[in-house]
């Protein structure tokens, strides 16, 4: 069993020079930005060896359960609960089946939230002009309205330890993973459609 508490204070600050701030540098412009966040978390994880070496029964070499929970509180948006449940079952010493379900959460970075607007002139290829490279004025910046990225994850698999000569190991396995992401956080690059 593991139990823990975590506390984090984070801040970010990027102060632009006066020429960049006034858009006086050709081909570039800048801005200043800053942001901060405090976060606390509590977590517990429990591994339960249901059947093992001391209480083995026919058809079950080992059986184990796992349960975990994490609760986080953020100063700049809501709280989050993230559970995890897993099972491992080995009918023999060499064959193992496993499965896990987990809710996951990723907060927006301070950079993605608070980055100031900047202007640049990247070279883009315009398909309407025969893929000719041209410079276009683009503006980019943070978004203080971003929501956290959340996901539901399921994994399952089976592995088999192949009998081999002494000091040589070979394990074969097959796994299945499914990740359902919501509100995925990503930067959009400059492009022409």
Predicted regions and their residues:
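Outer-membrane beta-barrel signature, preferentially recognizing the C-terminal barrel domain
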Residues: 108-173
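Residues that define the transmembrane beta-barrel architecture of outer-membrane proteins
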Residues: 36-42, 79-83, 140, 150-154
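Extracellular loop and loop/strand-boundary signature of outer-membrane beta-barrel proteins
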Residues: 26-34, 68-73, 141-144
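Outer-membrane beta-barrel translocator domains and adjoining extracellular loop/strand segments
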Residues: 13-20, 57-59, 77-83, 111-115, ...
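Transmembrane beta-strands of outer-membrane beta-barrel pores
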Residues: 5-13, 50, 69-75, 101-107, ...
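Outer membrane beta-barrel strand-and-loop segments of large Gram-negative receptors
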Residues: 147, 173-193
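Residues on the lipid-exposed face of transmembrane beta-strands in outer-membrane beta-barrel proteins
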Residues: 1, 42-48, 85-89, 99, ...
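Short loop/turn motifs that connect adjacent beta-strands in outer-membrane beta-barrel proteins
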Residues: 1, 51-63, 94, 163-170
């Amino acid at each position: 069993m593991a139990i823990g508490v975590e506390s984090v204070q984070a801040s970010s600050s990027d102060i632009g020079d006066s020429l960049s701030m006034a858009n006086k540098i050709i081909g570039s412009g800048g801005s200043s930005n800053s942001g901060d966040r405090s976060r606390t978390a509590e977590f517990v994880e429990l591994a339960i060896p249901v059947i093992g070496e001391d209480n083995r029964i026919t058809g079950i070499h080992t059986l184990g359960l796992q349960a975990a929970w994490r609760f986080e509180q953020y100063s700049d948006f809501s709280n989050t609960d993230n559970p995890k449940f897993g099972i491992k079952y080995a009918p023999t010493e060499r064959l193992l089946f496993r499965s896990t379900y987990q809710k996951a959460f990723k907060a927006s970075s301070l950079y993605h939230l608070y980055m100031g607007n900047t202007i640049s002139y990247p070279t883009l290829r315009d398909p309407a002009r025969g893929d000719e490279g041209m410079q276009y004025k683009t503006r980019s910046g943070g978004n203080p309205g971003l929501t956290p990225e959340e996901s539901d994850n399921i994994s399952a698999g089976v592995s088999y330890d192949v009998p081999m000569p002494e000091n040589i190991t070979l394990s074969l396995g097959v796994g299945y993973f499914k990740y359902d992401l919501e509100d995925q956080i990503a930067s959009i690059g400059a492009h022409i459609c």
